[in-house]
Amino acid sequence: VTGVRTARPDDARELVRLRRLMFLGMHGRDEPGPWERDAVRTARRLLDRELPGGERLGAFVVDGDQPGPRHLAACSVGSVEERLPAPRHPAGRFGFIFNVCTDERYRGRGYARATTEALLDWFAERGVTRVDLHASTDAEHLYRSMGFGEHSIALSIDLSRRG
């Protein structure tokens, strides 16, 4: 697949549109709201390589070619986290992929794989030794074919209501 490029700050709104589509696909409901405005602002800041922390977010996209306003066909977005070093991870640099989505008009063209491969290369160039993600049922086969597998039991807690 050709046409994969690094996302720019002016892609922020489209990255958030694709993120909303990803949540719709995962949860079966559309959830617009103020989070989108905040997400656009955060994405712009993190994609600006001139600002501190601009290298913590990796984002790769494919531009859409359908008629209408400029839009993205697909994206893969992740971040680098620095932790204490460990025996198999002496640099302590880990990656997390948190947003992979292909607009339904472009599915089946290999864009999710291509953007995710570009993101994995970006992680490797930064000394990341392990990358994690949470796969939807529909995308699990894609990630397994790329070499992802179970690492440990992932547990989460929602602290939004904790005072």
Please state what every model-predicted region is.
Residues R45-V61, F96:
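A short helix-loop-beta-strand connector motif used in the catalytic cores of GNAT acetyltransferases and
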Residues G3-R17, G28:
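A short beta-loop-alpha structural element at the N-terminal edge
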Residues V80-A86, P90, D132-D138, R144, ...:
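Conserved catalytic-core motifs of GNAT/GCN5-like acyltransferases
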Residues T116, F123-A135:
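Conserved GNAT acetyl-CoA-binding A-motif
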Residues R20-L47:
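Conserved GNAT-fold acetyl-CoA-binding loop/helix
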Residues Y106, G110-A118:
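Conserved acetyl-CoA pyrophosphate-binding loop and the N-cap/start of the following alpha-helix
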Residues A59-V61, R70-V80, F96, C101:
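Conserved beta-strand in the GNAT
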